[in-house]
Swiss-Prot record:
Any Pfam family hit: MDM10
Organism ancestry: Eukaryota, Fungi, Dikarya, Ascomycota, Saccharomycotina
Keyword Lipid metabolism recorded: no
Entry-linked PANTHER family: MITOCHONDRIAL DISTRIBUTION AND MORPHOLOGY PROTEIN 10
Membrane topology listed for this record: Multi-pass membrane protein
Quaternary structure and partners: Component of the ER-mitochondria encounter structure (ERMES) or MDM complex, composed of MMM1, MDM10, MDM12 and MDM34. Associates with the mitochondrial outer membrane sorting assembly machinery SAM(core) complex.
HAMAP family tied to this protein: Mdm10
Gene designation: MDM10
Record keywords, A-Z: Membrane, Mitochondrion, Mitochondrion outer membrane, Transmembrane, Transmembrane beta strand
Swiss-Prot/TrEMBL GO biological process terms: establishment of mitochondrion localization; mitochondrial genome maintenance; mitochondrial outer membrane translocase complex assembly; mitochondrion-endoplasmic reticulum membrane tethering; phospholipid transport; protein insertion into mitochondrial outer membrane
Entries under InterPro entries matching the protein: Mdm10
Protein name: Mitochondrial distribution and morphology protein 10
Domain observations: Lacks alpha-helical transmembrane segments, suggesting that it resides in the membrane via beta-sheet conformations similar to those predicted for other outer membrane proteins and porin.
GO cellular component: ERMES complex; SAM complex
Length: 459
């Protein structure tokens, strides 16, 4: 689960049209979210408040071994108007999960907004207690496609009392590149990522059978000047969506030739509420291998009894997998009136407006009319255009689904462990609790490695 400060940082990127998925470090972000999620340790309480559209503060307390905590502050020159607290935020925004890759999409801004975005900046600082540990971050937009990112840590327990990392990033729909310098070991780095695919601005009649199929190829190079040690890794990511079901999938292949390590992942969103991930690691120097499997399962809020007849009728129409679509709270979201004449509905004169996914752009890019799902199988339009409608409708259903909780799980054969994480709502709080169980290598008996619970509140 994201902290509120991480959530605000993602909203800042979205409001300034900065594509996080187009960065080399996030090539395997989906598999990391489904397999390498963290388990809370002990009990923790996070309380955050957003005083204005430009500033926010946060405090956390935990009792892991000793009572400790932190104070944080964030300032954004760009107003973050579409952010929400833990009471209203959707779980899709609060929890890291499957990412649909769209490197060619960029938000639209007016001339006034563009000038503000080009000068946008974000300041973040956190102080830990007890102790004197500090951390800070600065994000400064240089132009519409470039930004400066600076991260600093001040801790007496690390070498020289602290370290600083500077990123100069350029992010365009076709490629991205980063120049990195770290004061630790005088480390120099370069990352690049190039996307092979067709932009979404292409005419719909020319869209191939698999829409938004993108192949991303990237690499990173490192050199530590003090230790005179190099580093190298490469990665390939393939992302696509099926036109028959609209379900996206992502495959990645990463390789570190110096260490002899290769890793492949396969991630697929099997329905609106479920995702499955698998990862295979192999080292050609030691011949060691490992297989990891993870899943993510969302739970819907129980729909009102008024809509049960409607969903029963819709399941009789197999034009798309209606049994995987989320129940919605407003008939106007469905786009069509129910066909069951035995049930009457009282529609309001004006449809109610609601914001479900603040991180997604508030335009019509995803928000198509879902009534296009209920067309007759005898399509009188091109198959590619109808396939595009199915994919957009599936994505629209994911964004507008009202989930009450999410369950994550992962296991690793080589590590002989199982992790479970549950994130849900309790009144105005977001609750995250989980457990990690390992097998003792000597007795082969299960033992609890980590267990905890986190309560988060933001307003």
């Amino acid at each position: 689960m994201y902290t509120h400060m991480e959530y605000l940082q993602r909203c800042f990127y979205k409001s300034t049209s900065w594509n996080e998925d187009n960065i080399y470090a996030n090539v395997t972000a989906t598999s990391q979210a489904l397999l390498d999620f963290s388990i809370p340790s002990g009990a923790k309480l996070d309380v955050s408040t957003q005083a204005t559209d430009h500033s926010a503060s946060s405090m956390s307390l935990s009792n892991m071994h000793t009572i400790n905590g932190s104070l944080a502050y964030l300032f954004s020159s760009t107003p973050l108007k579409n952010t929400m607290g833990t009471r209203d935020v959707s779980l899709q925004d609060a929890v890291a999960g499957f990412r649909i890759i769209e490197p060619f999409f960029s938000g639209t801004h007016t001339k006034t907004d563009s000038s503000d975005v080009n000068r946008a900046s974000l300041l973040y600082g956190r102080m830990y207690f007890p102790g004197t540990a500090l951390e800070a971050m600065l994000i400064k937009r240089i132009s519409a496609s470039a930004q400066l990112l600076v991260k600093c840590i001040n801790n007496p327990h690390i070498r020289k009392g602290g370290t600083m990392i500077v990123y100069l990033q350029e992010n365009t729909p076709r490629f991205s590149r980063e120049y990195i310098y770290s004061t630790n070991e005088a480390l120099f780095g370069f990352r690049c990522l190039y996307n092979f695919g067709k932009p979404t601005k292409i005419s719909p009649a020319l869209i191939p059978k698999f829409d938004n199929s993108v192949v991303s190829v990237g690499a990173e190079f490192w050199y530590a000047a003090l230790g005179m040690s190099p580093g190298l890794s490469t990665a390939v990511r393939y992302s696509t969506r099926s036109t028959s079901t609209g379900k996206p999938l992502t495959m990645t292949l990463a390789c570190n030739p110096i260490l002899g390590h290769i890793s492949s992942t396969y991630n697929v969103k099997t329905s609106v509420s479920s995702t499955v991930c698998s990862k295979y690691d192999f080292n050609w120097f030691s011949y060691a291998s490992n297989l990891s499997i993870g899943f993510e399962l969302y739970n819907f809020f129980k729909p009102s009894h008024v809509f049960k007849h409607y969903h029963a009728d819709q399941r009789r129409n197999p034009s798309i997998h209606h049994d995987t679509l989320a129940p919605v709270a407003d008939p106007y979201v469905l786009g069509t009136r129910p066909t069951n004449n035995s049930v009457s509905y009282a529609f309001p004169e004006k449809p109610r407006k609601r914001v479900v996914n603040s991180i997604q752009n508030l335009d019509d890019y995803y928000h198509i009319n879902p009534s296009r799902l209920h067309r007759s199988p005898a399509y009188d339009v091109d198959d590619d255009v109808s396939g595009r409608s199915v994919m957009e409708a599936f994505q629209n259903s994911v964004n507008e689904s009202n989930f009450s909780s999410v369950l994550k799980g992962s296991t690793s054969l080589s590590d002989r462990m199982v992790k479970l994480l549950w994130v849900g709502r309790y009144k105005d709080f977001l609750v995250s609790t989980g457990i990690k169980v390992n097998l003792n290598p000597f007795t082969n008996l299960p033992e609890i490695n980590k267990i905890g619970v986190t309560f988060s509140y933001a307003c």
